Amino acid sequence: MINVLAVAGLPGSGKTTVARIIERRGYLYYSLGDVVRAEAERRGLTPDKTAVTMRLERGRKAVIYELLKSVKPGEKVVIDGIRSIEEVEALEEFLGTVFLIYVVASRKVRYQRLTGRGRSDDPLSFSQFLLRDLRELRFGLADLLSRADYIIVNETKSIEELEQEIGKVLLELR
């Protein structure tokens, strides 16, 4: 059985929704975005600047190493917001085999979701949205698509449809 599930995808693709569904199936939930937002608050910076700064100061694995301080080997965990192959490698190094789920949705759908959720790090304009995508891709997010063990196309799926799909995936992992 695989105990470590990682969820990746561009902002607004539905990563957190997928990860929270997995959490309800008995996995402990951890968010790399929460790590960055907490560090941003501590530093008095925006989450975007903090994500870049952490990686520049301490390398591409900086955020995942911070998160790993809270995770115990052997726990069933879902990690929300993986950004690079290096982060997956760090998880594998400390926790064992990782099953990577990549969530995709169109730009239009993702932008609509982001502008409707009201988080402090959400874009205020379409140009900010595009810049955020570019930053995420520079972290190595695009490379994860070829490493994904499972891809969810989350364009118009209801929560119930996502729950059914994820339930089938988790059954196969047993």
UniProtKB/Swiss-Prot annotation:
GO terms for molecular function: ATP binding. This is UPF0200 protein PAE1629. The keyword ATP-binding applies. ATP binds at G9, L10, P11, G12, S13, G14, K15, T16. Disulfide bonds: none annotated. Keywords: ATP-binding, Nucleotide-binding. It holds the Pfam family AAA_17. The keyword ATP-binding applies. InterPro entries: NTP_hydrolase-rel, P-loop_NTPase. Belongs to the UPF0200 family. It comes from the Archaea. HAMAP family: UPF0200.
